[in-house]
């Protein structure tokens, strides 16, 4: 039991008593206990996401060949967490994620300008004119909205599959780290630079602080 508790603590950052309780609830099944702890941790993380973040770090990543680079600002609540291994690893992983995601332009859906959404909606509706001709008006609208959301979500970092574990989204990875360190974490902005481009793509600030 002791070894299982230690393993769960290492994987989740949860306390000893929480790990023991999860193992008891899961009847000794480590995988089930891990899932229970993750669910509880993510629920706690949601409660922390409105808290102010005034510390953090600026992370940089330059891809092999020096033709692609990323700068990002990742915020947390205290200097202690900013210097912690989980936070620094998250910053590094996010920078690598951004480097790998050529289509990403925004941190989250709420940052997409309404003018961009309307423009894409018009394009999609025009492309589907013949396909939607015989469908009810309400259904046409639903189909267009779904296509628009699918297309634009590819540009939102938090919605992307995590490059190191595609069963998780980037947002879930951030929430897992929030649960692990016990503080709110917020990706404030990022810029992606490609050699030969006139400017890097930089996002605005998140809106949930």
UniProtKB/Swiss-Prot annotation:
Q: Where is the signal peptide?
A: none
Which InterPro entries does the UniProt entry name for this protein? EF-Ts_dimer_sf, Transl_elong_EFTs/EF1B, Transl_elong_EFTs/EF1B_dimer, Transl_elong_Ts_CS, UBA-like_sf
- Chief location of this protein? plastid
State the superkingdom.
Eukaryota
User: What keywords appear on the UniProt entry?
Assistant: Chloroplast, Elongation factor, Plastid, Protein biosynthesis
Q: Which GO terms describe its cellular component?
A: chloroplast; mitochondrion
- Does the record carry Calcium as a key word? no
PANTHER family referenced in this protein's UniProt entry, alphabetically: ELONGATION FACTOR TS (PTHR11741), POLYPROTEIN OF EF-TS, CHLOROPLASTIC (PTHR11741:SF10)
What family does the Swiss-Prot or TrEMBL record give for this protein? Belongs to the EF-Ts family.
State the protein's purpose.
Answer: Associates with the EF-Tu.GDP complex and induces the exchange of GDP to GTP. It remains bound to the aminoacyl-tRNA.EF-Tu.GTP complex up to the GTP hydrolysis stage on the ribosome.
Q: Write the protein's name.
A: Elongation factor Ts, chloroplastic
What is the organism field in this record? Answer: Cyanidioschyzon merolae (strain NIES-3377 / 10D)
